[in-house]
Structure formats: C-alpha cells, structure tokens
Amino acid sequence: AGGQTGETAPSGEEISLSEEETVASEPSGAPAVSLKEDFSGVLFIGDSRTVGLSEYGDLGQAEVFADSGMSVFTLFNKTVKLRSQEKSGLEELLCSRKFDTIFFMLGINELGYDYDSIVKQYKRTVEKVHELQPDAAIVLGANLHVTAEKASGSSIYNNDRINALNRDIKSMAEASGYVYLDVNQVFDDENGNLAAGYSSDGAHVLGKYYSVWVDWIRETLGTHAG
C-alpha cells in the first residue's frame, strides 16, 4: 500500500522546509515547470509512493496513474482506476488527454532486475511517455531511500542500489532536458538513509508526511493560479 498511517515523528517536531531543501535540479534548456495551485493539468505516474501521495497528500485536480507494484517493465501493460473511477491503460490516457506536467517516479520495484536492463527500460519508458505528450514538462523523481534497518537486511533493496539508480535518472534528466526532483533531502537522516521515525515499514513515509512531500513539490517548483 502507499502510506503508513502511524503518527510517530522522528523528534516530535513538524518538518519545516529550509531554502536549501527546496531546490530542484533543473538543467539548462529544461522547460520551466510552474504548477497550477490545484494541480490541474498534472499527471503523476508511479508506484506505491505515488499511491501514498494520492491517498494522503493533497494532489488536487491532478490525474494519478499509479499502482503499488508498478515498474517500468509493467507500466504500459497495466490498467489503473483514474479520478473518474474509470479504468485506463497509460497509452490510452496519454493519447486521449493533454497534460502540462508529468511527474514520473519509478524504480524501487525494479531493483531485483539486472541493473543495466533497469536503466535501459527506464529510459525507453520515459521516452515513450514524452513521445505521446511532447509538449508536457517531464519531471523525474528520485526514488525515496529506505531506512538503515531495511537496507541492512537486503542485498537488493538498499540505498547503494537506490543511489546508483537515482544518479542514472538524474543524468538522464540532464541529458534529455527534463527536471530532476530529489525529495530525499527532506526525509533523510544524517547518514543518507530514510530517517526511521518517518516510517513504520522502512520503505514508505508515514501517512501524515505525504502532505509534507506535496508541500515540498509546490515550494520547489512553484505554483500559480489557474
């Protein structure tokens, strides 16, 4: 599932976003991304973390194409229930509607695959999305880190592998004129792991922190009235 609903906070304090934590990597030549306040014209594509953003954060009028098991290997083969409650495949959705901005955040479910095949399929998948929506600004989201405890118990789902994939995603964004957005700076501990107090399962933030994540997206990219 997307979010964890516990109420534990790492230090009993609410997160406040510093100026340093609201900086996106926006390559030169990338289209300017400015979101409408109600997120209309925005599409979020992703896995369980995006499901969490949809269920626990306020994505307003955004469309969401996300599923807990989603990966770049299954993205164009799955159907998902949209805001309208109708089911749709991604290609059908991208061919029938026009989006201003598309957020793309996948990668954690892919980590068990051969690494080179992950990067190649990720690139192919993003390129296909862009071909179907050539006028949309593409935002590639870094994969959220896991906690130190979660990482220590797995040779696959650990932050070394997540960081390697995130570096390749960032390079892809820079090479293709997309925007790269890394939320880990908001939720990491001092050692670069997902801070344990933000999570109960080691891989997702608690339900209440998805609204912090959405606020960070708004502050980082900026919003304007429709």
Name each region found by the language model.
Residues V146-G226:
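Catalytic His-Asp segment of secreted/periplasmic serine-dependent ester chemistry enzymes
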Residues A1-I45, T50, S54-E55, A225:
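N-terminal secretory targeting modules
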Residues A32-Q121:
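Conserved SGNH/GDSL esterase-like catalytic core that processes O-acyl groups on lipids
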